Amino acid sequence: MQFVDEANIRVEAGRGGNGVASFRREKYIPFGGPNGGDGGDGGSIYLIADRNINTLIDFRYTRDYKAQNGQAGMGQQKTGRAGQDLIIPVPEGTIVRDLDTQEMIGDLVEHGQKLLVAQGGRHGLGNVHFKSSTNRTPRQCTPGEPGDERNLGLELSVLADVGLLGMPNAGKSSLITAVSAARPKVANYPFTTLYPNLGVVRVSPESSFVIADIPGLIEGASEGAGLGVQFLKHLSRTGLLLHVVDIAPMDGVDPVESVHVIEKELEKYSDALAGKERWLVLNKTDLLLEEEASELCDQIVERLNWTGPVFAISAVNRVGTDDLVKEVAYGLEQNRLKAQEESVEE
């Protein structure tokens, strides 16, 4: 299935039903009073987060959504039937904006969360409401009001605890394959990953986290080069970034320089993303002798002046990946506890 993370749609809520003007007409009561009923309210439109949907592709083919109109009122003070609400499922992590005002309407992050995006029109009033001591036979009634109309922008930002960063062919897909049940395409050429992959990492029966792999970044990504820029937003919700580095690239690119390239792209994209906690994962140690790999990893860390956590692994052979997973799970738990403490203090 194609991965689509942006879509524009138009929504129109139902119009309220008209009120009606009518009068009692019964045997022996030729001139009864008003008994015109109200119309029904127009149907509203809601978006609802659904964990079973993971792309916005359906909105590429259906862009216009309209809820049901309310029915007109009837005699004998019968109210018209209300229009049925329209409920549209979207993936968890969908941000909704009004395209005309650029206002963010909502952020649907939990399964079952509903968001009203177009309010149905209010019903019209029947003539029974206009009877008074001076007007015993009112003929006025009111029409139903139109429902809201909106042009909406939907933007999907995947929900993951951990995001993988790296140049194309750094081994990110191999890493997510090694630590989770996800099976992205893995090959020895750049841009094997064309859209975000999510994997659930189970540390124990009681502990797990979600990891996201996005297409590799290249220099100029923040200006649109390569594939990664359109997916950088998917890292915005993560609590931790794992920066995967190929320590022995076949094209001879300096691993330290590749780290600097991505750091610059993160800074250009947003300060928030550049400031996220980031761990260094030095991958493909299996391509060198153990002593050579260890020495090269030390050199990379020293040249980067890296002071954060560092892990040397071979994702293909799953060497060092268990320790990485355990440390990530522990780090995420510590971050959660810290956030809880800060919220209590506030």
From Swiss-Prot:
Keywords tagged on the record: Cytoplasm, GTP-binding, Hydrolase, Magnesium, Metal-binding, Nucleotide-binding
Gene Ontology CC terms, in alphabetical order: cytoplasm
OBG-type G domain sequence ranges: 160-333
Cited Gene3D superfamilies: GTP1/OBG domain, P-loop containing nucleotide triphosphate hydrolases
Cellular localization per UniProt: Cytoplasm
Disulphide bridges, residue numbers: none
Biological process annotations from GO: ribosome biogenesis
Positions contributing to Mg(2+) binding: 173, 193
Record domain Obg: where: 1-159
Main location group: cytoplasm
Family: Belongs to the TRAFAC class OBG-HflX-like GTPase superfamily. OBG GTPase family.
Subunit structure: Monomer.
Entries under NCBIfam families matching the protein: Obg_CgtA, PRK12296.1, PRK12297.1, PRK12299.1
Name of the featured protein: GTPase Obg
